[in-house]
């Protein structure tokens, strides 16, 4: 009786699977997570002479109007634009979270990829808390999408 012939290799060994990759991402994400509610000193005093954004990133910077503004007005504009940016960040994070949750409705809840997505969902939620607390701390009302915009957001297919 002869030994069966060896089949030629189909190529190099397969690399990491999707689950292997998800496990690695999950472990890395957990190590880098933080809790902004406890990790940031929300009671620290704000420096009244400090910009909320780098001046060069403020919309009017470098214009004659910017040059005609007092430092206090420039700081206030940076404060308003900071809050606008954080407000937009909250709503983009919210859209991402909705998309992740909708996707996970169709996934295996025991899969490493699902666990990683849940970790990401938690991180995005903590970002929203951090942005909201920062907005509250600087004392400016957040910018919210109008009702019709929220309805459109809820109709997005992802």
Q: Residue locations for each model-derived region?
A:
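Alpha-helical transition-metal enzyme core signature, strongest for iron centers
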Residues: 89-93, 97, 120-135
């Amino acid at each position: 009786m002869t030994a069966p012939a060896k089949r030629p290799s189909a190529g190099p060994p397969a690399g990491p699977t999707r689950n292997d990759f998800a496990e690695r991402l999950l472990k890395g994400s957990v190590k880098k997570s933080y809790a902004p509610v406890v990790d940031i000193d929300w009671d620290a005093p704000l420096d009244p002479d400090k910009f909320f954004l780098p001046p060069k990133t403020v919309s009017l910077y470098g214009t004659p109007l910017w040059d005609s503004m007092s430092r206090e007005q420039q700081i206030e504009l940076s404060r308003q634009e900071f809050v606008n940016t954080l407000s937009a960040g909250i709503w983009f994070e919210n859209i991402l979270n909705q998309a992740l949750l909708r996707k996970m409705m169709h996934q295996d809840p025991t899969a490493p990829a699902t666990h990683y997505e849940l970790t990401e969902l938690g991180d995005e939620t903590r970002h929203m808390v951090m942005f909201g607390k920062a907005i509250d701390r600087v004392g400016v009302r957040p910018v919210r999408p109008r009702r019709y915009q929220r309805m459109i957001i809820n109709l997005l297919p992802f």
